[in-house]
């Protein structure tokens, strides 16, 4: 029997003494699917709100087997820590990194791996993948060529180097629009705008290198280019073509070659005239939309089996 801790975004107003309320109802279902399956395999499962980490220990912890809040056991007693649903961590990166380092020092297994988290949180990984030959939208650090290209009528997408769920991503069409980020230009990557993104992103979920399921994310309206759920995007089930599957696996293999272990991931791509084009490799706590497709229970079994295998190996 192993101890497994999951960090979750909590809806404190809805939490009761015998129920840890996850921020979104859809996520609540996913989290409990994982937990039920892990318990069926003989593991002890604990939930914690990352806001409750003080120093190197949590001040509150929910023991899901017992359906009760308990005195938090030391993190050193955890065999696996799953950095899962977390709200707003991009707005407090120093504390987030401190948490990840605390987990790495305390537990033999952290998913996703701290090395992968540290690397993936910086969107400049897209430049590295591009250098390795993967097709991505032409990407560069913000420089004066951005203003020059906008003056020529070429739209540019600005993407925060540290950001999540499409927040802060902007489509710029004129130099005057750059006033919105004046003084913060160094915090952005600049990408060529690829019109094909309006057709939607193809997203594929993996555990390790094993494909789980895929879905097509679409923007909320013809004028929107972001497909993120937080921006009103929708999703439908979608199965990858052979070319898309090979591209996704190549992306993961390339990322692993950077010294970043691969566990739980989502690879986002679009179609282009040159073939699949990578938009993001989500390797921190990717949204998987499982409940939207009634895949929560099935995926819960698979992720529980995956964690069980990690703990046995």
Residue map of PLM features:
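Active-site nucleotide/adenylate-binding loops and adjacent lid/helix of ATP-dependent enzymes
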Residues: 2-17, 24-31, 98-200, 242-245, ...
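A short, polar/proline- and glycine-enriched secondary-structure boundary/capping micro-motif
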Residues: 17, 223-228, 289-292
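Conserved N-proximal alpha/beta basic substrate-recognition cap immediately N-terminal to
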Residues: 23-138
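Anionic group-transfer/hydrolysis microenvironments
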Residues: 51, 86, 161, 193-194, ...
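Structured loop/turn residues at beta-strand edges in well-structured enzyme cores
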Residues: 76, 134, 152, 260, ...
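Conserved residues at the C-terminal ends of beta-strands
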Residues: 84, 142, 217
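Phosphate-binding site of ATP-dependent enzymes
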Residues: 165-258, 270, 277
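ATP-dependent carboxylate activation and anion-phosphoryl transfer catalytic cores
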Residues: 242-313
């Amino acid at each position: 029997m192993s101890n497994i801790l999951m960090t979750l975004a909590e809806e404190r107003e809805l939490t009761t003494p015998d129920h840890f309320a996850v921020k979104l109802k859809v996520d609540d279902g996913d989290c409990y699917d994982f937990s039920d399956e892990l318990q069926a395999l003989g593991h002890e499962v604990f939930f914690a709100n990352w806001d409750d980490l003080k120093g190197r220990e949590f001040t509150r912890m929910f023991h899901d087997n017992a359906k009760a809040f308990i005195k938090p056991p030391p993190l050193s007693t955890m065999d696996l820590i799953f950095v899962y649903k977390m709200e707003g961590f991009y707005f407090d990166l120093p504390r987030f990194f401190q948490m990840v380092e605390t987990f790495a020092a305390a537990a033999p297994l952290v998913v996703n791996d701290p090395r992968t988290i540290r690397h993936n949180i910086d969107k400049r990984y897209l430049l590295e993948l591009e250098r390795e030959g993967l097709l991505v939208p032409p990407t560069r650090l913000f420089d004066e060529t951005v203003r020059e290209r906008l003056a020529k009528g070429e739209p540019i997408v600005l993407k925060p180097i540290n950001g999540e769920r499409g927040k802060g991503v902007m489509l710029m069409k004129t130099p005057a629009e750059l006033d919105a980020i004046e003084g913060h230009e160094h915090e952005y990557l600049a990408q060529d705008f690829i019109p094909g993104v309006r057709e939607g992103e193809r997203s594929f979920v993996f555990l390790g290198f094993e494909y789980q399921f895929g879905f097509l994310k679409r923007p909320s309206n013809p004028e929107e280019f972001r497909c993120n759920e937080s921006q009103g995007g929708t999703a439908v089930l979608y199965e990858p073509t052979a070319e898309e599957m090979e591209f996704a696996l190549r992306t993961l293999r390339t990322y692993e070659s950077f010294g970043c272990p691969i566990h739980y991931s989502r690879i986002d791509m679009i179609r282009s005239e040159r073939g699949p084009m990578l938009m993001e490799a989500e390797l921190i706590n990717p949204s998987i939309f499982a409940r939207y497709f009634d895949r929560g229970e099935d995926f819960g079994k698979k992720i529980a089996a995956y964690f069980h295998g990690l703990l046995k190996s």
